[in-house]
A protein has these predicted regions:
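Short amphipathic alpha-helical segments
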Residues: 11-18, 66, 70-74
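Conserved SAM/SAH cofactor-binding pocket of Class I
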Residues: 145-180
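Conserved hydrophobic/aromatic pocket- or pore-lining residues that grip, position, or stack substrates
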Residues: 56, 125, 144, 164
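Non-catalytic accessory regions of SAM-dependent methyltransferases
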Residues: 1-55
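Non-catalytic substrate-recognition/targeting regions of SAM-dependent transferases
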Residues: 39-52, 68-137
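Conserved SAM-binding loop and adjacent beta-strand
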Residues: 130-149, 153
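Carbohydrate-binding surface patches
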Residues: 57-62
């Protein structure tokens, strides 16, 4: 359910208000990053929708038939709420099949490079929104990368071997810590 109010009309105006509220809530935090999850599905009242911001680009996953139906209105609402102009769709998760939806990837609004550099804790991190896992980056590991840099700074380990590198975020964190 997108609303627990029986009389709530589900339309573009309603979706715009939900998107604007979620985007505004993320502005309350100083994340030391220009990579942030703006819409987290059910937690923001939009089940089946994931939206991440990477610099000046939004990346969205429309994972349910409900959000798929309202995709154009949601895309417009997101760009209005953020003031951005680019939205890349990564609706290629296998769960879409259960909803009778085919995988979709590509630019939904605007266009640009799919290889993006974001800033996190003063570091530059590269990702690819077209080929990366889900929307392109593990934003939820921001605090872990910062803690890893702190451990490196205090010389809690002598060497680091990153055998399972995805984007190099932990390697960058270790190097930043060792240089501090």
């Amino acid at each position: 359910a997108w609303s627990f109010v029986e009389t709530q009309r589900i339309d573009a105006a309603f979706l715009a208000s939900v998107c604007a509220r979620a985007v505004a809530a993320r502005g309350l935090f100083d994340l030391q990053s220009d990579g942030v999850r703006l819409i987290h599905g059910e937690a923001d009242g939009l089940p089946g929708l994931i939206v991440d911001r990477y610099g000046d680009t939004l990346v969205a996953q429309f994972l349910s038939a409900g959000v798929e139906r309202w995709k154009a209105a949601i895309a417009d609402a997101l760009l209005e709420a953020t003031g951005l102009h680019k939205l890349y769709e990564r609706s290629d998760a296998s769960g879409r099949e259960r909803e009778g939806l085919k995988p979709v990837t590509g630019w939904l609004r605007g266009e640009g490079a799919t290889e993006i550099t974001i800033r996190e804790h003063g570091w530059k991190l590269s990702l690819d929104i077209a080929t990366g896992h889900k929307t392109g980056f593990y934003l939820d590991q921001r605090d872990s990368r910062q803690r890893f840099a702190e451990l490196a700074q205090h010389r809690r380990f002598r060497r680091v071997l990153n055998c399972f590198c995805y984007t190099g975020g932990f390697t960058v964190a270790a190097l930043a810590g060792l240089q501090a």
